[in-house]
Amino acid sequence: MIKAVVFDAYGTLFDVQSVADATERAYPGRGEYITQVWRQKQLEYSWLRALMGRYADFWGVTREALAYTLGTLGLEPDESFLADMAQAYNRLTPYPDAAQCLAELAPLKRAILSNGAPDMLQALVANAGLTDSFDAVISVDAKRVFKPHPDSYALVEEVLGVTPAEVLFVSSNGFDVGGAKNFGFSVARVARLSQEALARELVSGTIAPLTMFKALRMREETYAEAPDFVVPALGDLPRLVRGMAGAHLAPAV
């Protein structure tokens, strides 16, 4: 029986694309490009550091990825800009259905497991007004690895006192879905973009940076096991969990 629902943060509960407003203000006309390449390199650097055994916390990785991205445009980040970007990342917009989804999942244990550094995650959750929605906000920093390393998912067992069979893991990121399934969790993928919608964007002509991001990050990975469930939005998750757990969840508002 499911006793805990554990969420990825970036891209699942919080929209990483919302940082584009800040990058566009800083570099008009180049904000979308910066946002997409930055996120891509952020993920790549976390995986490369994990493979090389050279851990740095997620804000360090994020700064490295931003420096790379600006370098492709011949730009150098200054400390003022980096401070602004840190604030932007700590104030990412939660998806519109996130708060309601979390409320409806009570009294099951609700947690975040994220690559984010502890201070980043605490600020992110607090700024969104969601602190009371979680029993735990778990950072991989405690293990000095990044998802999808198995040690990162083991933190859920240690912190929440549950077995993999008692966890439903929720993510919109293909690499995270694969990692969580590999660890032994039941997994629900939030599929906000249908294959049909993506195909229409890809054949429409010029591929915008955001469309490329969708192609790279918003599909299931072919190398990994498929998720147990697919939901189009977080608002559909409580109904799924009720069916799985027979749980007495908070009523929909």
UniProtKB/Swiss-Prot annotation:
pH dependence: Optimum pH is 9.5.
Region annotation Important for catalytic activity: where it falls in the sequence: 171-176
InterPro entries: 2-HAD (IPR006328), HAD-like_sf (IPR036412), HAD-SF_hydro_IA (IPR006439), HAD_sf (IPR023214), PGP-like_dom2 (IPR023198), S-2-haloacid_dehalogenase (IPR051540)
Reaction(s) catalysed by this chain's protein: an (S)-2-haloacid + H2O = a (2R)-2-hydroxycarboxylate + a halide anion + H(+); (S)-2-chloropropanoate + H2O = (R)-lactate + chloride + H(+)
UniProt superkingdom: Bacteria
PANTHER family: HALOACID DEHALOGENASE, TYPE II (AFU_ORTHOLOGUE AFUA_2G07750)-RELATED, HYDROLASE, HALOACID DELAHOGENASE-RELATED
Protein name: (S)-2-haloacid dehalogenase
Species annotation: Xanthobacter autotrophicus
